[in-house]
Amino acid sequence: MKNLLKQLVETESPSHVKAAVDRVGSIVAGECRKLNAQVEIIPNKKTGDHVLAKWGNDSKNGVLILCHMDTVFPLGTLKTFPYKEADGKIHGPGTLDMKAGIVITLSAISSLLSKGTAAPRPVTALFTSDEEIGSLTSRKHIESLAREASIVFVMEGALLDGSLKTWRKGVGEFNVKVKGRAAHAGGDHKEGRNAIEEMAHQIIAIQKLTDYEKQTTLNVGIINGGTASNVVPEESTIEVDVRVMQPGEWERLEGEMKKLKPALDGTSIEVSGGLNRPPMPFGEVSQAAFKKASQIAKDVLGVELKAGGTGGASDGNFVAPLGIPVLDGMGAIGEGYHSDREYIFANSLEERAKLLAALIENW
C-alpha cells in the first residue's frame, strides 16, 4: 500500500494541469486492470480524464466508490514538501486529500478478490480529475452512477478521531462588482465616485448575513480595486465564500444579495454567482446507512464507528439530494489539508481498507 501511495504522491497532479492528472489516471487505470476491472477512460479536453472501473456485469443496486486524483498543490511542491514517512505518519502533498483514499479503495477490492469473496452487489469506482475545482466535468457522471447505486462511499479523509463525515455544508460563491467614477484624487476628488468606499459598505452588509444558529457563513475572502493611490477608484470586486446547511438558506441569501443597494450616489452594484455543491445533511437515509455500517463494522471488525461532519464540501454533496445513502470520510485519518502540514497516520491505511472491504462484502 505504501509503495503505491508513494508513487501516487510523487506523481504530482494539480487540477489545472491535464497532463499531470492524466499521469495519475494512467497509474490508477493500470492498477484497476490488475484487479480484473472493466476500465473506461472518460476523456476531457481541458482537465484530466476520469477513470471508471467496474467489478461485476451490472452497476444497478451496487456499491459506488468516489475518489479524486487531482490535488491543490502546484507542480514542484515536492521540492519543498517531499513524500516522507516518519514517526508513524506519512507526509506529502495530497496524501490525505486524497491519494490515500485511492490506495485504500484498491487495497480493499484486492483483498476481497484475493480471498475469493464475491461481493453481494457489483462495485463501481469512479476516479475523477476535477474535484478540487468544483467537479465541473465529473458531476454529471457522479450523479448518473449514484442514481443506480444502493450505497455511495466517498474516500475523502476521515475526521481526526476517525469519525465518518455523515454531513457536510453546501458551498457556493457570490461575486460582487461595484462601478464608480474615476477622477484625479487631488484635482477632481469631488467628481469621483469611490468604488472601494462603496464596496466597504456592501462588505459590512454581506458579512451580517452570517447566521451561526443556522450554520450559515459568508466570508469576503478576496477584494480588488483601484489602479493608483492618486486615482479615485472606478471599480472594485469581491469574492464571497458561502456555506449553508439548512434547506432554503441559499435561496434566502440569493434574495438578500439581490436586494443590495448602493450607499453612494453615482455607483452601481452587480451580483453574480451560484451554489456549487448543495448541503449533505445527516437525514433519515444517511442515518439508516450509518446504522447499517456501524453494525457491520462492529460484527466483522469489532470496531465502533463514529459520526461527524464538516463545513467543507465534497462530491458526496452531489449524492445526498438524490436520496441515495452516502457515507463520506471513508479514507485515511490525518490532518493538514491543503497545506505543507498534510499527513496521514500510516496505520490508518490498512485499518480503513479493512473497513471498506467489510462494508462492500456485507452491504
Regions flagged by a language model, labelled:
Residues 3, 13-14, 31, 157-158, ...:
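Metal-dependent amide/peptide-bond hydrolase catalytic core
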Residues 89-103, 184:
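Glycine/serine-rich anion-binding loops at beta->alpha junctions
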